[in-house]
Amino acid sequence: MIHIEEITKEYPTKTLFASASAHLRPETRVGLVGRNGTGKTTLLRMIIGEDTADDGSIRQRPWLKIGYLPQELATPTKFTVLQAVHRDKYPEHEAKRILSGLGFEEDDWNRKLETFSGGYRMRVALGHLLLSDPDVLMLDEPTNHLDKNTQVWFESFLMNSKMTMLIISHDTKFLDRIVTHIWEIRDQQLQECRGNYSEFQKLRLQLDTQQASAAQRQAKEVARVQKFVDRFRYKANKAKQVQSRIKQLDKIKVIEAKRDAKRLRFRFPEPTPSGKMVLELHGIRKQYGEKVVYENLDFSVARGQRVALVGENGAGKSTLLKILSGIL
């Protein structure tokens, strides 16, 4: 369906892909993995034409319908939830079914998007994408804004769909349950593996172990040959053998063992001593449209406390942080 052929993508300080190739086959569900910054999102954007490769090509059938959900989305807020999902193109009853699965109550369907949190707006965008039933569904961290119940429904939807999928996710359990193949971005290449994430991890460990052993054997052989060259370089009766060994060394393609990821070390500077009470809110009220988020809310944080802010999506967690920081 989609053929990625010998693509190269470079930036001034970094090369993401160097003659990388892969093929997305019909009705496969592929998890795209790799360290942060290796080019996962860039690859999706190149497939849909929002970015271009410096060399190589990405070919797809001309009739292919691709649906793409990025990590962040600017959803038009003038629509109601229901309008944003069906867009006067798709059956309303199907839109309602998907909205229910994504955690929207019937009372929510005719509310304006602007009254919802960013997480719920992403759910609306996801709902529209699922309703559009593309040939290829590409998702970038789709579970970030889903709670447990909606994720169960979402996974069931994907498993019962015949769409071909290319999914970026750091949720390895989600990948284990959903994908049939893994593409790993590694050493500027796309490496394909059949199976889910756990199966890929086992194979990757085996390959890394084999590569480390091969690198060690090669290093010993190079050292042995180099020792011969150094010892007999200036001996006339060994000149032919020395030249042969030098050519042998020149032809060797160095095997590199996998290096462990770099560990970042940092520390926060000591802050200026604060008062005993760091933050205080009294009688706070916040409303979006007709939706009341807080009513007579009291909140305080004392010096030295470490507070976890939890709640359902749309409960007002981000709004509270914005109020505390003075943005709202």
How does the language model describe each region?
Residues L203-K258:
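Intracellular alpha-helical coupling/juxtamembrane segments of multi-pass membrane proteins
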Residues D230-F232, L264-R267:
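Short hinge/gating elements
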